[in-house]
Amino acid sequence: MVVVLAVSGISTASDYQQGELVIGQVESGTDVWLDGVQVQVSDTGLYVFGLGRNAAPGVTLATRLNNIRTETPLFVKQRSYLEQKIDGLPSKKVTPNAESTQRIRSDNQQIGEVRQSHSQAHWLGQQWIQPVEGRISGVFGSRRILNGVPKNPHNGVDIAAAEGTNIIAPLAGQVALVHEQMFYTGKTIMLDHGLGVTSVYAHLQHIEVSLGQVVKQGQVLGQVGQTGRATGPHLHWGVTWQKTHLDPLLLVN
């Protein structure tokens, strides 16, 4: 996580990279834009934005206060991502049937509604912690090509751990989604951390929080499982800013 401080102008770090969440502070009443798109600013002047998997090498951060506008180019380090090709799979392993497709659409709609949140209340500004300790079995941004068909990139990280291991909240937030059986992700929780930042926890064995509950950093959310489409016990952990997927490991490292 990189911190950008801006008052009348902008002070920037020099090493941004794809998949990163950027947090900034401006004087109250300042407007902020990223590449011409206005960014939400809290009542205290805190703002955040995300640099996605395919963020361009250069983006422009702009602020305006008292009719004085400042623009600063930010240079974004480009990353390479793992790619795995698997051929000869049965078609049902690559393309879901009509019933499954309908379930997937319903799941995606519910997840999308949570990610549209722009609550002013937020729990940002402190260091994130890892929700569970274990081997990183799946990395952000990797992609599988199944029978020649590119699938969506992996939009989070997978952490392998023993079934039943406690999963804790990496940052305080409000429980925005609790689902007992999503098609791909099984038992799933989403937290709203404010200002468009949300996180998801998937394949859980058991859920210990309820919708609307405010959880503290370090509070138990549930336990590691292998529900949904999982080949072994692990936690899928994802973080987004609005609809932009971010690399969770950059938040804790």
Identify the residue ranges that each predicted region occupies.
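Cleavable N-terminal signal peptides
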Residues: 1, 10-11, 141
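Cationic-aromatic interfacial patches
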Residues: 7-80
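Extracytoplasmic
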Residues: 17-19, 27, 44, 56-58, ...
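Surface-exposed, glycine-biased beta-strand/turn segments
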Residues: 73-185
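Short, well-structured beta-strand-loop connectors
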Residues: 166-177, 209-224
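Zn2+-dependent peptidoglycan hydrolase active-site motif and core
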Residues: 170-205, 233
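Short, conserved catalytic or interaction motifs in soluble domains
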Residues: 180, 206-209, 226-229
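Conserved, short, structured surface segments that act as functional micro-motifs
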Residues: 187-193, 197, 213-253
